[in-house]
Regions:
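Ligand-binding loop in jelly-roll beta-barrel domains
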Residues: 90-115
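Short strand-coil-strand connectors
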Residues: 72-76, 101
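Short hydrophobic/aromatic-rich beta-strand segments that constitute the beta-sheet cores
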Residues: 52, 71, 106-108
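Short, conserved beta-strand element in jelly-roll/cupin
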Residues: 44-45, 55-71
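Short, charged/polar surface micro-motifs in flexible loops or helix N-caps
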Residues: 34-37, 45-50, 68, 114
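A short, N-terminal "cap"/entry segment at the start of jelly-roll beta-barrel domains
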Residues: 1-39
Length: 115
């Protein structure tokens, strides 16, 4: 078969080192290993210092699954809730801060691969 299925029971996020005061877990579910030109996965953000991601080399689309997240960029913030979709364009110097007061979980697709 040409498609690649990852059963829900096989998807487990793992901690990503994002600094001592931040906590973020994620897993790339589909990426180069499956021959994809993009990276797709699940990310969980926990309370703590905001997590910053640069978008110098990739763009992202994220679909909120659970909880709430706040995205901040250049002093502006946006709240994300379940069902919301956000597009973050690829742009040199673009830095987006992700944070939550409780918990937030989302599905992401980056193009090209973010790692």
């Amino acid at each position: 078969m040409e498609f690649h299925l990852v059963p829900a029971g096989e998807i487990e996020t793992e901690p990503l080192d994002v600094g001592p005061d931040s906590k973020l877990n994620l897993v790339d579910v589909i990426d180069r290993a499956q021959g994809a030109p993009f990276c797709a996965g699940i990310c969980e953000v926990f309370p703590g210092a905001p997590v910053d991601f640069d978008y110098d080399d990739d763009a992202a689309v994220c679909y909120m699954l659970e909880g709430e997240l706040t995205l901040a960029e250049d002093g502006e913030t946006r709240a994300l809730r379940p069902g919301d979709v956000v597009y973050v364009p690829r742009r040199k110097g673009l830095l987006v801060y992700w944070s939550t007061d409780s918990y937030g979980k989302f599905f992401y697709v980056t193009y090209p691969h973010w790692r």
